[in-house]
Amino acid sequence: ANLNPAHQPEVWRDFGNNNQTSAANRPWMPCPGNHEIEFNNGPQGLDSYLARYTLPENGTHFPGRWYSFRVSSVLFVSLDADDVVYQDAAAFVGGPAPLVPAASTGRPPIEPGTSFYVRGYSNGEQTRWLERTLRHAAHDDDIDWIVVQMHQDALSSSKTGNGSDKGIREAWLPLFDRYGVDLVLCGHDHDYERSYPVRGCNHRAGVDAKTGEVVETLQPRPVGSNDPDRTKFDTSHGTIHLILGGGGTSAPLDVYGENPSTGFAQAKVFTKPNRPVPGTAPNTFVRQPADALEDAIWSARRDTGTGYGIAVFDHDPGKPGGHTTITMRYYHAPGADQHPTAQYELFETIELSKKRRER
């Protein structure tokens, strides 16, 4: 809603109307992202978001921002990545004119160059909660799978979108490795991308996007076979990241980075904040794109045909002494760029499998 700051209530109304048929028939368990952060809307800009969802308690000073819940033997963990990302991508006034809030609010104009940057707002409380939650799950025999959802991406090779963020890699990927997170679901970039299982990282494998000097990006390290056609995985050896950003957008971003020297997949990475700087026109401001590049050795599959699609997951809890599986089918809509009711086609199917815990 922060893209339409003078009409935020109407945007939320329209969003709810669009979703009500689905939400009336299945639970909607959201996570906040950069576009939920609005000026004049509470300390993290999330009051409109929090007012519209009743979410599980997290026992911290920040209710509703992050939470967990269990379905069968799957633990779902929902996070607010704005707390840890370097990218400044929330509410912003680019100028040259100030942003004038709706008259009914009585709020003063917001000057050009102002951005609502909330990195670090929980002072580590979210990360401490996450570690407690994952540690408990790792020792709970009733939990076979850990699935994390967040808005921003630790692993994205989008060329025209945002890219990857080192802040997530620093704060949370070590915890995902330590406690065996199986799957991470993200959005932010409006496309589809699947990683190989990753664990650990390669150091100083990135370069500055402008100077070419070596920089630290904490490049995620793939484990196992790097066959892009492989469809079955044991996630006890590494975490798979999925970008599912094609559920509905007017700006599909199905264009991906490529290293011009090698032809390999390439990713942009934010390794530091991109706070507003003066633009070329008087009294205007811009936020720079990601500052670093790395070879996306972790990228297994990218959908270059369309930015639109949906993922469907099926969980089989298995039988005692056997295996349990999660099957993901991604359906894309190649004609959606021209027709709003394009037919969905199966793009790929993957199966995650592991030995079921003894109950």
Predicted feature descriptions by range:
Residues 9-13, 128, 169:
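Well-ordered, non-membrane alpha-helical segments in soluble/globular domains
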Residues 5-9, 120-124, 166-167:
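Soluble non-cytosolic domains of exported or imported proteins
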Residues 41-148, 153-161, 170, 174, ...:
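Metal-dependent phosphoesterase/phosphodiesterase active-site architecture
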Residues 1-40, 178:
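Core catalytic region of metal-dependent phosphoesterases/phosphodiesterases
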